[in-house]
Amino acid sequence: MLVLVSPAKTLDYDNPAATTEYTLPKLTQYSEQLIEECRKLTPADIASLMKVSDKIAGLNAARFESWSPRFTTGNAKQAVYAFRGDVYTGLDADSLSEDSLSRAQSQLRILSGLYGLLKPLDLMQPYRLEMGTRLANAKGTNLYQFWGDVITDEVNASLKEQGDELLVNLASNEYFKAVKPKLVNGTIITPVFKDRKNGQYKVISFFAKKARGMMVRYILDNKVSNLEELNKFDMAGYYYCEAESTAASPVFKREE
């Protein structure tokens, strides 16, 4: 079982990672090409393109400028510990056991606008480049065109490496669009999380993101390897709703 998640906008480079182990990202030759394009942008360009404040635009212009093709523990941090945000709150990587972290390294992949696909312990320099950014590049007008089949090929390689054909999509639509489902050598499962509010069950972004992270944690801690085990997910009050589920899209609900 291979699991895909989105990255996060919020980063933490102040606190040390929970492990000194690290690996190096595989697709940095592509990252370098994107950094070259990003360095052409002024802070005002970045503010407009990314719809961020002048302060955040300035910070990211500086990040693009200082980005180096050489990754060290001085300029980078393991991705799963660097990302902060709702998904990563749910995952709580800081408290993973050694066994669960080891499973994460083979079973969890993080989609990224700049790095393509990251293993949890891949060193990552700070950046902000969301997959939906319309950044003109040598291959087109956006990052989906830039990455083409590259990310899908890496997903297939990771699926093959970890030994089965089940791909659990816990990423957002924006990020999963970088994967080409028809080219995936496996079965794609996309869990849906619904919370009850005002008498109705609906997908509430904040809760759904956190639930995705909790499901990753559940998979790692419980050595989940098939759909039957996945559907037993019951963290934080969620329960499997068979009536609304399909094989490709299991639905999990939670009361108010």
Curated annotation (Swiss-Prot):
It comes from the Bacteria. One of its GO terms (biological process) is response to hydroperoxide. InterPro entries: YaaA. Signal peptide: none annotated. GO terms for cellular component: cytosol. Pfam families: H2O2_YaaD. Disulfide bonds: none annotated. NCBIfam families: PRK02101.1-1 (NF002541), PRK02101.1-3 (NF002542). PANTHER family: PEROXIDE STRESS RESISTANCE PROTEIN YAAA, PEROXIDE STRESS RESPONSE PROTEIN YAAA. Belongs to the UPF0246 family. This is UPF0246 protein Swoo_1284. It comes from Shewanella woodyi (strain ATCC 51908 / MS32). The lineage of its organism: Bacteria, Pseudomonadati, Pseudomonadota, Gammaproteobacteria, Alteromonadales.
